[in-house]
Amino acid sequence: MSDKIKIPNDNISALLGAIDKKFEDQEDFLDIVQWNLRWFNAMQKDREEKIKQVLSVLNSDIFVFQEIEEKSLDNIAKTLSDEGLGSYRTAYGTTGGQQRIAIMWDMEWVRSKDDIKELFGKNAVTIPSGKDVFPRLPLWSYFYCKSTVSNKRGFDFQLVGLHLKSQMDKSGIGEDELQRTLAAVKLSDWLMKDASNLDSDTILLGDWNEPPEAPAWESFRRLEKEKKVKFLKINDQSNFSHLYYRNRNNPGSLLDLKVITSPYAKELNKVGGTIRWLALDDLLKSNKAAGVVKKIINEIKKEITDHMPVLTRFGLDQKKK
């Protein structure tokens, strides 16, 4: 008889209230937190401590980060491991200078099956002016996730961390949108061809720098219509991850997105989504003055980052295997 393996440090399920019933018996799940840390390096000790505190509460199976200096997460990973919150390892992209993509994973539950590397190469796809459509190359990884059921094999999956071109167009002729559009086309093509060479789920997530309805992502919406990926269905536009402030009803925008392929993978919309600090969440639901909301948002932006961490819980039905 197979028994469920107890997870003593599953803080995320505690924060969410419980493990969803559909995961209690026959299904396994994987928690991934996406977070743009905005120009983070290990010399910023106050920020490092605050970020470490947040990550110690979340202690996700995998974290995908953006705007990271190389090796700057190593101390955080060691501290989390020393405190018994996992056995974390880190990997960094090589492009983006001091604003790289990074992945941190808990080896107690997730193991890499191949070297973590960047896709495509520099200048593999450019716009007419010669600019690379990927200022930071997508960071690819291939993992095995251990099952929470004893005597059962876990599951393999591919994960690609993204940080696509920002909405800064110095030329004034829409080059940034063209870069994002061509990046999406390239990723869609890779997803349908190269990614399918491995018998596994594929997850693309990161800072896309535009909301899911943006024209640039038409290639993914087309694949979703063909039932080859999930995109709009798993990106709740009523949520927000990037902090700016216009008014009480429009405090941010959803720029941190995800795409997933596989008939087995399921995203729990009820519990997935942006993780907000309770103070901010309570304020947005209350009748507090808009000025108070703005003050809290500015404090978060100043102390940590202008992005909220985004949680996605993916599940795999072992009975379908």
Question: What positions do the PLM features span?
Answer:
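Sec-exported extracytoplasmic/periplasmic mature domains
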Residues: S56-S60, A77-L85, W109, D189-S196, ...
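N-terminal, active-site-proximal structural segment of metallo-dependent hydrolase catalytic domains
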Residues: M1-I101, F157, A184-V185, K285-K321
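Active-site-proximal segments of metal-dependent phosphoesterases and phosphodiesterases across multiple
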Residues: L164-V185, E213-P215
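His/acidic metal-ligating clusters that form di-metal
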Residues: N151, T181-L205
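Structured beta-strand-rich core segments of catalytic domains in phosphoester-bond hydrolases
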Residues: I68-V160
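Metal-dependent phosphoester-hydrolase catalytic domains
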Residues: M1-D20, K71, V133, K193-T202, ...
